[in-house]
Amino acid sequence: RNITIVTSDLSIATFADSNLPRADVLLLGGALRKNHRYMTGSITNEILGRLHLDKAFVATDSFHEEYGFTTEFTGNADVKRLIIRRAKERFMIMDASKVRPPSFIQFATVNDFDTIITDYDPDGVLARAIADNGAHARLIEAKPERSARESVRTDSSESFAIGRQVDG
């Protein structure tokens, strides 16, 4: 099966290239955000707007019951919204520390995801948000293995998607 990992994050691209020899990696172009390792801007958005993605894996700076998933940078929010919109299946990946007051800009709500994966749900905040919003998202609580957590160090709010290449 041909798998292509699409990301705007240099750390994710490097990790995937080094550790997933059967996967192709598409690093989205764009403006490199100062002091971060990911691309944003109109070039990134233009490329994303042309892609059809099977699965999107999105992270967040914070989650708040009232405000949803938020991030600190507007350009990052735009990329996340596009990835979510272009994917058939959408996953939020977050740890419990992200349940906190909102960051600067909202990019999604629980209704935008098929699955939300976390290490645990503090005080049932995520489950309550899913129920209160009539969302269809599955909530999965999974403690990551220590080696998996340490394997890739990225800005904790980055995203990537997977698409299949069609031969011929």
Walk through the language-model features, giving the residues of each.
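Glycine-rich beta-alpha loop segments
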Residues: R1
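Conserved phosphate- and dinucleotide-binding cores of soluble alpha/beta proteins
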Residues: V6, L10-G168
